[in-house]
Amino acid sequence: MDINTDKYKNITRNLEREMINLNPIQRGGILPTESKKIIYEYWDGYSVCDYCSGRLDQIETPPINEFLEDMSKFLGMDITRPTHGARESKYAVMNSICKEGDYVVLDGNAHYTSYVALERAKLNYEKTDIEEYPTFRVIPESYAEKIDMLEDSKKNIGLILLTHVDGNYGNVADVEKVGKIAKSKGYPFLLNCAYSAGRMPIDGKKLNVDFIAASGHKSMAASGPCGLLSINKKYENEVLETSKVNVLKELQMLGCTSRGIPILSLMASFEHLIERVKKWDLELEKTRKVVNELEPLGFKQIGEKPRNHDIIRFETPILDEIAEKDKRRGFFFYEELKKRGIGGIRRGVTKEFKMSVYGLTNTQVDYVINSMKSIINELR
């Protein structure tokens, strides 16, 4: 067999070690030092299963069972299971409580994985309305309108889904309003918290939520792939139904899910998560400072104002103007940031970009702001 494996040796990544990373999909998943230590203990395959009696969520050493109970308290829910990510959590709900052909009513900012999950579960969807440019906020009242429309058409509704914080604009949806609508209409309510649980405080019961889909690698300082599904006890029998062949194994989990470093890294980061969500107001202060400092340069923040989440989306006509005369064209901004030790902005993009300063120190935030100012002022 003629295979050269040299390219797979000594693979390295220096973005986090040597640069300030502004990628919003990565800021919430950065591991604290104490969580990195656990990797050396559990990097072998199935090492988490040393003392397993057949179910991942029941393992006592390491204390996965206690961790899941504590995570339920943290999220304000009753029962929690580990998954491989928020998308798998959403699919588990759809595939268990909905019938083939049912409709999922979901927001206009829903992540593509919500559509992939419902399509895989052989479901239909009805998308609710959002505000127009430049805010793009979810309109809660549209849920009631779409539900009424489907009911009038004799269509079966299986689930109401809301994206708590969308990845395009970083808008925080009004969960309580949508939750009240779902409850009054009598439909189960799933909240996609991929960009919120672990970054900001969440209380599922206060929000009238039946299910929470969370992402460990996106927002809970965990290695990927890792996620969580938290549910209300009311749906335990449906969502956590066990196999007829192997009565221990839960069908929607395919027996066991995150069985290695990802779940252990999430456990090791739990104390860090508990503490950091208490400082959410400070994160918003840093985010709003970035917007306030950069908009006078010719940036325009898209989405709700003031910012209620760390994701920032800027339209940047000033960068487009510079790109027209710079010999590096659209790559100049990426290269100038890289010179200054800043990464995470997509290469070749000048019309708009997304960023986040979540978890950065105030000194780092000021450095990012001043670096962008210097780039614009030097090249405009």
From Swiss-Prot:
Reading the lineage from the top rank, the first entry is Archaea
Output the InterPro entries linked to this UniProt entry.
PyrdxlP-dep_Trfase, PyrdxlP-dep_Trfase_major, PyrdxlP-dep_Trfase_small, Sep_Cys-tRNA_synth_arc, SepSecS/SepCysS
Query: A single Pfam family, by name?
Result: SepSecS
Q: Does the keyword Transferase apply?
A: yes
User: For this protein, what is the EC number?
Assistant: 2.5.1.73
Residues binding pyridoxal 5'-phosphate, per UniProt:
A86, R87, N192, S215, G216, H217
- One Gene Ontology MF term: Sep-tRNA:Cys-tRNA synthase activity
Residues annotated as carrying N6-(pyridoxal phosphate)lysine in the record are K218
Q: Which cofactor does it need?
A: pyridoxal 5'-phosphate
**Record flagged with keyword Protein biosynthesis:** yes
Q: Which UniProt keywords apply?
A: Protein biosynthesis, Pyridoxal phosphate, Transferase
* Catalysis performed (reactions): O-phospho-L-seryl-tRNA(Cys) + hydrogen sulfide + H(+) = L-cysteinyl-tRNA(Cys) + phosphate
Gene Ontology BP annotations:
translation
Subunit (UniProt) = Homodimer. Interacts with SepRS.
Function as written in the Swiss-Prot or TrEMBL entry: Converts O-phospho-L-seryl-tRNA(Cys) (Sep-tRNA(Cys)) to L-cysteinyl-tRNA(Cys) (Cys-tRNA(Cys)).
What family, per the record?
Belongs to the SepCysS family.
The molecule here is called: O-phospho-L-seryl-tRNA:Cys-tRNA synthase
Organism encoding this protein: Methanococcus maripaludis (strain DSM 14266 / JCM 13030 / NBRC 101832 / S2 / LL)
